[in-house]
A protein has these predicted regions:
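Core segments of cupin and vicinal oxygen chelate
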Residues: 2, 12-64
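Short, flexible turn/loop "capping" segments at secondary-structure junctions
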Residues: 2-6, 75-78
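Short, small/polar residue-rich loop motifs at catalytic or cofactor-binding pockets
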Residues: 7, 54, 108-110
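Vicinal oxygen chelate
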Residues: 14, 18, 28, 61-66, ...
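A short, polar/charged loop-to-alpha-helix boundary motif
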Residues: 130-145
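Terminal, contiguous helix-loop blocks that mediate binding/assembly
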Residues: 145-155
């Protein structure tokens, strides 16, 4: 059975940690795997300044969704202008993804369900009904005081 066509694939720029990050992320999410690793050739090494034979890209799937990581050097860094959102069905899932992805990350970057992982990539760990919850002023007020989202507290504040 062939994989469905995906029009959009996140492409993440790392300094030298593309394969390490792919291994880390695929260890956290179900239905995840590294699908390909490419290495810098003599030609691409000369053009990029990256060592010949070192990892250039790591293609992987997170819960079946394609992602590519590039070892492009220190030129570009992740920032909060882009984040990956993980929709969670219950508090146990929120706790799991929050605990795994925040490990080694920046605790100062944790607010309102957002976290920054050890590679500097921002994630939002949210309940599946976050869009409905943030339509309620009580839920939003509760969220403003949270780091990791507490679904029960947000729902209680919505009533």
């Amino acid at each position: 059975m062939s994989r469905p066509f995906r029009r959009i694939t996140p492409f993440l720029w790392f300094d030298t940690q593309a394969e390490e990050a792919a291994t880390f992320y695929t260890s956290i999410f179900p239905n995840s795997r590294i699908t390909a690793v490419t290495r810098y050739s003599k030609e691409s090494s000369a053009a990029s300044g990256r060592p010949e034979g070192s990892v250039m890209t790591a293609a992987f799937e997170l819960d079946g969704e394609p992602v590519t990581a590039l070892n492009g050097g220190p030129i570009f860094k992740f920032n909060e202008a882009l984040s990956l959102v993980v929709h969670c069905k219950d508090q146990a899932e929120i706790d799991h993804y929050w605990n795994k992805l925040s490990e080694g990350g920046d605790p100062k970057a944790q607010a309102c369900g957002w976290l920054k992982d050890k590679y500097g990539l921002s994630w939002q760990i949210c309940p599946v009904d976050i869009e409905a919850l943030v339509q309620n002023p009580g839920s939003v007020a509760a969220l403003m005081h949270m780091t990791k989202i507490d679904i029960a507290a947000m729902r209680a504040a919505a009533t």
